[in-house]
Design a protein with these regions (language model features):
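Short, structured helix-loop boundary elements
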Residues: 2, 42-45
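An acidic, carboxylate-rich microenvironment
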Residues: 19, 47-50
Length: 122
C-alpha cells in the first residue's frame, strides 16, 4: 500500500499525470473536500486523468509531503503538507505568485493491487 501511495505522490509532485495514474485502478473514485464541501469528484481513471491534466496549469510549482501514514485495514490515511505557488490569478481570489502552505489528509483505498479510491480532505 505504502509503495503505491509513495509512487502516486512522487508522480504528482513531478506533474507526471501518466505515471501518477500507473498504480490507479481503472474504476478509481476521487473526491476533493475543502472546508467540508466536495469541490471536485471523478469516476474512473480517464476522468481522474482529465482533472489532473486540467489542474497542471493552476500552479507553477507544487509539492505534497507525507507527514504521517497509517493503515487501517484496506484504508491508508496520509497526513499531507501541501506547498504550491499559484501560476495565475484564479476565480476564487488567489493571485499569481501567491504561496500556499496547507495541511490536510488523503485517504486511499485499494482493490486488485491498485488505488481504487482517493479522498483529499483539507
Amino acid at each position: 500500500m505504502r509503495s503505491l501511495v509513495d509512487h502516486y505522490i512522487d508522480a504528482y509532485n513531478r506533474m507526471d499525470v501518466d505515471d501518477m495514474l500507473a498504480g490507479v485502478h481503472p474504476d478509481v473514485e476521487f473526491r476533493n473536500i475543502s472546508a467540508g464541501v466536495v469541490n471536485a469528484s471523478t469516476s474512473g481513471v480517464v476522468e481522474l486523468g482529465k482533472l489532473a491534466r486540467q489542474s497542471l496549469s493552476l500552479f507553477s510549482e507544487r509539492c505534497q509531503r507525507i507527514e504521517s501514514f497509517e493503515v487501517q485495514g484496506t484504508l491508508a490515511v496520509a497526513s499531507i503538507a501541501f506547498h504550491a505557488v499559484v501560476a495565475g490569478d484564479l476565480p476564487n481570489g488567489l493571485k499569481k505568485g501567491q504561496v500556499l502552505n496547507l495541511s490536510g489528509r488523503s485517504e486511499f483505498e485499494f482493490r486488485d493491487g491498485a488505488i481504487s479510491r482517493i479522498t483529499d480532505i483539507s
